[in-house]
């Protein structure tokens, strides 16, 4: 169950989508049950209760696909290094007020839970002093703790992120050893309240999005290859909504696409 503020504030959902995917070319236009993937994502965003749903892309084909299914679409530059940069351009184009809440719904998440989208928006609205909100869930599988592709987050007493890392954090000094021969030999993780897996869903205040492009890339962001560390490096606080509902995975590879297509009967 997702725990968040029960009062849903007005918010805008933006679905950034780009065609230039190395592992899965033309990913936003991949057919899923008779509709392009980007449309499936936008539909989930609409189900979240967002006041407005926008598809943002540098590809006319993506914009045309979104508009053909009744969604508003906006053209963005092709040189954005991240989805956050693309959102920043959209925020600048629309001139949203500083307190407007904008949720980044990644364009390769056709199975995203609409309640989680709404949840991070509500969580940000309830988290004064934070410019960003995201989500996480407890880790119970030892293999996930030691998997660098699983991003971990450590929280403070108020549920604000202390750090995100691909490393196993926090390190259980008395339980872990530097190396194990195999996953089966790894110990049970510390209490689930301590070890959390980050979920790549973000809500932002428009004021932050306007300042984001001017923030210098940080050393820790480069080392970890985690763009959220740029905001933390520059002193921004990130509120974390903890959910016990493990989200379904997104689409990164042809195998992922086949799995999702099967769910939709493609």
From Swiss-Prot:
Disulfide pattern: none
Keyword Cytoplasm set for record: yes
GO annotation (BP), single: CMP-keto-3-deoxy-D-manno-octulosonic acid biosynthetic process
A single cellular component GO annotation: cytosol
Keyword Nucleotidyltransferase belongs to the record: yes
Record-linked InterPro entries: Cytidylyl_trans (IPR003329), KdsB (IPR004528), Nucleotide-diphossugar_trans (IPR029044)
EC assignment: 2.7.7.38
Name this polypeptide is given: 3-deoxy-manno-octulosonate cytidylyltransferase
Organism (species): Paraburkholderia xenovorans (strain LB400)
């Amino acid at each position: 169950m997702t725990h968040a503020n029960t009062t849903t504030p007005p918010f805008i959902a933006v679905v950034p989508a780009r065609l230039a995917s190395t592992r899965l070319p033309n990913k936003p236009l991949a057919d899923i049950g008779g509709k392009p993937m980007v449309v499936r994502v936008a539909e989930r965003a609409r189900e979240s209760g967002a006041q407005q749903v926008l598809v943002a892309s540098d590809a006319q084909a993506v914009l045309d696909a979104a508009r053909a299914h009744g969604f508003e679409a906006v053209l963005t530059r092709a040189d954005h290094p991240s989805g956050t940069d693309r959102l920043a351009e959209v925020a600048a184009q629309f001139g949203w007020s500083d307190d407007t809440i904008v949720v980044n719904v990644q364009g390769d998440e056709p199975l995203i839970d609409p309640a989680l989208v709404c949840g991070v928006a509500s969580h940000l609205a309830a988290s004064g002093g934070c410019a960003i909100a995201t989500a996480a869930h407890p880790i119970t599988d030892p293999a996930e703790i030691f998997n660098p592709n699983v991003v971990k987050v450590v929280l403070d007493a108020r549920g604000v992120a202390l750090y995100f890392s691909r490393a196993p954090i926090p390190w259980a000094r008395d339980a872990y050893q530097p190396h194990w021969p195999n996953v089966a030999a790894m110990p049970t993780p510390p209490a689930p309240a301590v070890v959390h897996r980050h979920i790549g869903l973000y809500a932002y205040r428009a004021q932050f999005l306007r300042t984001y492009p001017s923030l210098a890339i940080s050393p820790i962001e480069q080392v970890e290859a985690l763009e959220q560390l740029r905001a933390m490096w520059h002193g921004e606080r990130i509120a974390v909504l903890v959910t016990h509902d493990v989200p379904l995975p997104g689409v990164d590879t042809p195998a992922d696409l086949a799995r999702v297509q099967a769910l939709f009967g493609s």
